[in-house]
């Protein structure tokens, strides 16, 4: 299964290295070098993972992460940055990152962390949470069937609309 990864990294050499190895792992990689552009791409959705540098032109990675989470975008985020102090790692994770890797890094470690994130996400989607029924007033969302009804009448949604809803 091809997974979509958004790499938001201003160093073209690092971005190219990450993209090259992720492509070898059957990932479809989009690379963006400016924070604001990365935010727009991420909010457009459809990514299975975001690899995010912290020190970016246009918008810092922490602010980008904050905005994504404020918009209820819970795409897993792996922060990859030169900021290696404990306070930076803790801040990154508390801001909403799922993992944190400091530069310089081993490409093998990065790939192992990416695979671990994919495994966690896959196991989550196979749990009962993925099959739950969500009810809010007269709205019923059935995740397993990917269906929505309002007052008992089915609502036709595109896959993207359904993903945004849940």
Where in the sequence are the language-model features?
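Acidic catalytic/metal-coordinating carboxylates
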Residues: 34-37, 60-63
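His-Asp phosphorelay/catalytic-motif detector in bacterial-type signaling
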Residues: 2, 46-48, 72-76
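Conserved sequence signature across two-component system core domains
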Residues: 8-9, 32, 50, 101
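Short hydrophobic/Thr-rich beta-strand motif most characteristic of the beta2 strand and flanking loop
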Residues: 26-35, 41
């Amino acid at each position: 299964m091809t997974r979509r990864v958004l790499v938001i990294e201003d160093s073209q050499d690092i971005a190219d290295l990450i993209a090259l190895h992720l492509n070898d792992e059957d990932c479809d990689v989009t690379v963006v070098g400016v924070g604001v552009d990365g935010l727009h791409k991420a909010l457009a959705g459809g990514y299975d993972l975001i690899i995010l540098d912290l020190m970016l032109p246009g918008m810092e990675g922490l602010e980008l992460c904050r905005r994504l989470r404020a918009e209820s975008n819970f795409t897993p985020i792996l922060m990859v940055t030169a900021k290696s102090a404990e306070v930076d790692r803790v801040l990154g994770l508390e801001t909403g990152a799922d993992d944190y890797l400091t530069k310089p890094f081993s490409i093998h470690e990065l790939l192992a962390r990416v695979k671990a994130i994919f495994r966690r996400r896959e196991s989550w989607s196979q749990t009962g949470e993925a099959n739950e029924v969500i009810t809010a007033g007269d709205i019923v969302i059935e995740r397993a069937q990917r269906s929505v009804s309002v007052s008992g009448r089915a609502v036709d949604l595109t896959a993207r609309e359904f993903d945004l809803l849940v």
